[in-house]
């Protein structure tokens, strides 16, 4: 079993849930009502007193201040997501939970949602937790990653950790990988090395392919393969999850 704690306490504690805003993948909207009316209805449910100014502020913040009486069923996917974000912000949350906020959006819509999310953190101090499989988009805004498999957090990484894991590297395939690794570590102490399950060696840190190959040849170690590679975020996570399944 496990335990969930939010703000240092149980999420069931009185008042805790009011500090959390939530946007599910497809926000629940009343299609025959305007954005403003949807917001006012949510404000009423939250018990907010005289929420008109707050509603207008949030609609302006999310770029919906000029949509007027247009019914939300006529909104684009991006507009619906922005309204869902505004609804989630009505209670002035300290923590915002977003489930696939970029799913189904065109590049312009995704960029706009991403900009809003980053503004919420930078300008309003709101912590944003995003559940998503759109790794390319996450890589443009995340500062910390948590990898969940079968309900368990299997690894946490900072953005710096991920950048390092996804940095350029040389892939070295040698006849004697154990000896090759020892030779390279001694010759290039400032580089980082990783032994792979397929017996290849990855060399990180702006390694010179010619120097690496020459060093191994000088020691009589046959080089069977040597090439530069760039691992993107998706490849890194797929490899990591594969390792977790094997491990």
Q: What annotation goes with each model-predicted range?
A:
Residues 114-204:
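ABC transporter nucleotide-binding domain
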Residues 41, 57, 182, 214, ...:
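Surface-exposed charge patches
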Residues 63, 188, 220:
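Short glycine-rich hinge loops at helix-strand junctions in the catalytic core
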Residues 204-247:
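C-terminal coupling/interaction segments
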Residues 1-130, 135-149, 153-155:
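ABC transporter nucleotide-binding domains
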Residues 16, 180-184, 212:
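Hydrophobic side chains in well-ordered alpha-helices
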């Amino acid at each position: 079993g496990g335990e969930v704690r939010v703000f240092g306490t149980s999420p069931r504690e009185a008042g805790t849930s009011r500090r959390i805003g939530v946007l599910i993948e497809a926000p629940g909207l009343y299609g025959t009502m305007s954005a403003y009316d949807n917001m006012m209805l949510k404000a009423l449910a939250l018990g907010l007193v005289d929420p008109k100014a707050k509603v207008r502020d949030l609609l302006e913040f999310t770029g919906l201040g000029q949509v007027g009486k247009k019914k939300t069923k006529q909104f684009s996917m991006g507009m619906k997501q922005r309204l869902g974000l505004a609804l989630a912000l009505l209670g002035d949350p300290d923590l915002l939970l977003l489930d696939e906020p970029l799913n189904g959006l065109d590049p312009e819509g995704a960029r706009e949602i991403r900009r809003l999310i980053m503004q919420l953190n930078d300008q309003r101090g709101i912590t944003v937790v995003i559940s998503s499989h759109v790794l390319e988009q996450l890589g443009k805004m995340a500062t910390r990653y948590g990898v969940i498999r079968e309900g368990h957090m299997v690894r946490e990484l900072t953005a710096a950790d991920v950048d390092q894991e996804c940095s350029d590297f040389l892939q070295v395939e040698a006849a004697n990988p154990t000896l090759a690794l020892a030779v390279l570590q001694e010759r290039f102490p400032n580089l980082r090395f990783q032994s792979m399950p397929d017996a290849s060696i990855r060399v990180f840190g702006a390694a010179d392919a010619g120097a690496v190959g020459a060093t191994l040849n000088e020691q009589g170690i046959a080089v069977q393969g040597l090439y530069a590679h760039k691992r993107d975020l998706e490849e890194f996570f797929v490899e990591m999850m594969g390792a977790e399944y094997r491990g």
